[in-house]
Amino acid sequence: MDMNVKKKKLGLKEKYAHMTRGLDWQTSYQPMEKVFPQATFEGIKIHDWDKWEDPFRLTMDAYWKYQSEKEKKLYAIIDAFAQNNGHLNVSDARYINAIKLFLCGISPLEYAAHRGFARVGREFPGVGTRVACLMQSLDEIRHAQTQIHSLSNYNKFYNGFHNPTDMIQRVWYLSVPRSFFDDALSAGPFEFITSIGFSFEYVLTNLLFVPFVSGAAYNGDMGTMTFGFSAQSDEARHMTLGLECIKFMLEQDPANVPIVQRWIDKWTWRGYRVLTLVGMMMDYMLPKRVMSWKEAWEVYFEQNGGALFNDLARYGIRPPKWLDQISFDKDHISHQAWATFYQYAHASAFHTWLPNDEEMDWLSAKYPTTFDKYYRPRFTHWREMADKGERFYNNTLPMLCQVCQIPMVFTEPDDPSKICYRESDYEGEKYHTCSDGCKQIFDDEPEKYVQAWLPVHQIYQGNCFKPGTDPTVPGFDPLAAVLEYYNFGPGDNMDYVGSPDEANWLKWKGLAKEDPAKKAA
């Protein structure tokens, strides 16, 4: 009689090979270079795709089982947060403006990353890289969805949450993070992996998620904290994918080293410029602060990133360019950014305010060499104007950097009293950039950056009005027309003091008896 012999259970490596077998076939109807044309045009030389392996070896059956368990826990907490009026447990309604910025500026980028990884997963010939990109693509769309679901409860009670998908395409300050991803998505697959998988996910992700998630926890926002921690296990895989791809390219051919080095220089600088918004949030938008932007940069980039680049030195990779500029900027950029948003609060979908005396003392302690000298006098002057009923709004439009698209507000590395301007000439036209880093990036690829969609230029050209708008009619208000195009509603913009958000918060917390609409008016 035949005996049933129990089959040996496959190990993780064997199971991964079994589940992904057949994905790396050699084409016969068309040559491989026609099926994967993007794999060679950047100049990266790959001799053996089998040398790259996914260290997590995650298969689809394991992925869905693992993620479904996380989703159950996440949505249970989100439901409990909503049912128990969790929005009233945050430290102060000013904090809500930080997550308005997150929803409009970061969550759409998660969806853009989903699209990007789905695309490059098709463009890589190597099966291991394709499967890893597929998993990350799924992660990114899940992150976008869970962030929107977690923050949707706030949309019932606060202004400015209603239309992030239109805002990311139209609003002036959101062109900063959007241009970063537009730049990455219009690059080849290897540069995309370097920009998102390495520079952003590996080098800079802690500076994005740790301040937001820790800040949320410290300010009583359990919904934001929960989706942040839920995403952290995914981020570990994303960081590994980025680092493994970098090492894979460097190990395949020495000719890849200068190409990868240029990408690391470019995308570290571009990512750092995007994180200006995070620095502003850390220093000014959290009523209860976790750490300063300067401290976060020193811990998560200078120390952790320094160790990473020491490891990559054996491949011939040096630390990114312009670190001396960044070392100077870390004492300034958050203050310069907040001063800019304070002036343009009438054109922003979140509220701004001036730091009080206690908060300015905290900033003075964290930035002892710069805040009292350069920024406290400015804020004090604006407070005196506001006390007289002359709250300052800047009604002009600023020059924008052609690369990072941030207004030209940053100062020279050796002179904090002088605005940094750089110029480049291309085909008879002048283009302006905000720093040596952005100028070098422009000069390397001018044909790409001359096509940048700059919001200020578009406003002056009349492209930021709704169809049918006639700018020639008597009494035409261009700002009102632009805000209508942005789809801003009453109460989305202007100063926090006197806003419907402040009035409602005071009423809900029993701190004021006035009618919110009357008080806001």
Language-model segments: residues:
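Extended, helix-rich structural scaffolds rather than catalytic motifs
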Residues: 1-52, 256-388
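Alpha-helical bundle segments that constitute or directly flank the non-heme di-iron/ferroxidase center
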Residues: 21, 27, 92-124, 187-218, ...
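Acidic/His metal-coordination segments adjacent to aromatic residues that form catalytic metal sites
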Residues: 81-102, 163-199, 217-219, 264-288
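Long, hydrophobic, well-ordered secondary-structure blocks that form the structural core
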Residues: 101-177
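Inter-helical turn/loop segments and adjacent helix faces that build the functional surface
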Residues: 119-131, 154-158, 184-188, 210-230, ...
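Intrinsically disordered, low-complexity terminal tails and linkers in eukaryotic proteins, enriched
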Residues: 357-358, 362-430, 447-521
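Cys/His-rich microdomains that often coordinate metals
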Residues: 408, 438, 442
